[in-house]
Regions:
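Non-catalytic structural scaffold of enzyme domains
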Residues: 1-213
């Protein structure tokens, strides 16, 4: 059975991916590594993804591999360059950014893609991951992550769904939820917008399963 290392920078990312893996790929063995200081340090340091942050990601990945991981899935979308560096160092192992599978799927559709995040650094880093031909309309669901941190999941989902509805009004043809922690809001976004909604959780599982099959 494949052993999948799930490396998290937000505690809220743990439940969505574990639930989805248990449902869609129960044969996989899961190991979870959480360092929630990564996101906090990125948000307050002002240094961006500097050498120290890159080194932290390399150490997390090496620990996962030393523990027998056959594949690594990072679940926080604000650290793309750090994850790419890990993948370059370990070319024989599937190392996935949280959004790369969703980006590939979303890039196939026509029209403008509405991209919603609840963590502002994600909206700064993620657009560069899309091919140049993909038209993006970005939206920050302000206050949603704070609501989730306070245990108000319904408010979190409502704020994200409100942005999905606004993106539909601005002409978007489909919606992508940028963070693993947002997967729970998929149904609310579909109901509010009437548009197809992609989540990084479901797309990542499909990609990782294909790589390790």
């Amino acid at each position: 059975m494949p052993r999948i290392a799930l490396i998290h920078a937000l505690a809220h990312s743990v439940e969505p991916i574990n639930t989805a893996l248990a449902r869609d790929w129960p044969e996989a063995t899961r190991m979870n590594l959480l360092d929630d200081s990564l996101s906090a340090d990125l948000a307050r340091s002002g240094h961006g993804l500097d050498a120290a942050m890159h080194e932290r990601f390399q150490r997390l990945a090496q620990y996962a591999l030393d523990s027998g991981a056959n594949g690594i899935l990072f679940t926080c979308s604000a650290f793309g360059p750090c994850i790419e560096a890990v993948a370059r160092r370990h070319p024989s192992v599937p190392v996935l950014k949280p959004n790369e599978a969703m980006v590939a799927e979303a890039s196939v559709g026509a029209g403008t893609l509405g991209l919603i995040a609840t963590f502002e650094p994600t909206l700064r880093s993620m657009p560069a991951e899309f091919p140049a031909h993909v038209a993006l309309d970005l939206a920050l669901a302000a206050g949603a992550l704070e609501a989730l941190n306070e245990g108000d999941g319904a408010r979190h989902d409502q704020l994200i769904a409100a942005q999905a509805a606004r993106l539909r009004e601005r002409g978007c043809t489909r919606i992508a939820l940028a963070q693993f922690s947002m997967a729970r809001a998929r149904s609310a976004c579909e109901a509010a917008s009437g548009l197809p909604v992609l989540t990084s959780v479901d797309s990542a599982i499909r990609r990782l399963h294909a790589r390790l099959s």
